[in-house]
């Protein structure tokens, strides 16, 4: 790069192929190249390819959806509708019925008395193993259950491969907490009991070789009690309840829109709904490229860091509560808008966090800003040295400022202090430029109600607890004390 040009325009001009600052980096964009610059094992930035992920070669965690409801409620129809609308993604449907246990000879003799709607009828351990294997990106051979012989087929199975979305469907997929914990979205299909019974009679007589009397007897003896004892109570775990099942096209459309949004997010955003990564554009990735370069001048480092910080602050402010407000425009017309949150303050973690104060002041005129100093004693030890916070901080929403989220230990101590001062956990928004996955896990598991807003999630921490690929000691580089 020429010495007299470190502007982001230079980065844009030198990268081959078309670029648009508003374009999302949801996939690989390929174009001819003459040379490339890469960072081994982390992410690739070259003229030939550009990826929105931290590591294009790394497997991504699939999005797991659980779909349950009463027997014949329309679960399969809902799953089919979701699959059809997500046709551009790799989807695997795992039916809980495939994991019925094969009946013993004694159970077969009294098959009419066997309760197929009880949790013990399923091999939950194998279902868990199946999902774990699929989430790791490996193929799995799903057993095929024969409802006429009540045994698994020995010489047949269904091979499923790595995928983007896993749909777990079955009447009791919400019953076991271990299975629930694997799900990113839980859907309960709610259909009238009479409709479900009519569907059950038709299905079991046509597809499973049963007669009507045996279906009705089984329904009254096992199915209805199992629904009341196991299925209906699991409704409380659902994130989404769909009335009328597959007939509710509006509900399914909204679910698919949400899934599309989640599939475009970082894996950690799927796990923690309180983690928000600002939308990635070539401008943002270009600025990250500049501030991460070790030989950039201090002036340019500060300039592009300030630009990124401003974007993070603006995004963080968007998560504050707003009230509706109407104003009269110069034309005499009424404009319906919103009013900003009044009770707000910033808290910077000294000293790197102080680099974010100017952007916050530029966005919020006259905002109060407190300070917290935490001393690092060794790798994990933390000691609070100094704090000066607004006296009425318990009545305010707090923007916690720290440009780098590494281990999460100092962040946890700062958040704990704010909570001790009376700040509700849900009123804290933690703003940073880059975050390590370890730090996000550490903070979100302990404080699930606060929000984290960042511009990029990096790959990992190294043995020295530095963020990789990272950008070095941010405070030293920003304030010019790294020499």
UniProtKB/Swiss-Prot annotation:
Principal location listed in the UniProt entry: plastid
Residue span of region Uracil phosphoribosyltransferase: 274-483
Alphabetically ordered keywords of this record: Allosteric enzyme, Chloroplast, Glycosyltransferase, GTP-binding, Kinase, Multifunctional enzyme, Nucleotide-binding, Plastid, Transferase, Transit peptide
Reactions listed under catalytic activity: cytidine + ATP = CMP + ADP + H(+); uridine + ATP = UMP + ADP + H(+)
Region (Uridine kinase): 59-264
Binding site residues for 5-phospho-alpha-D-ribose 1-diphosphate: 351, 376, 402, 407-410, 473
Transit peptide interval: 1-47
Compartments reported by the entry: Plastid, Chloroplast
Protein name: Uridine/cytidine kinase UKL1, chloroplastic
Gene encoding the protein: UKL2
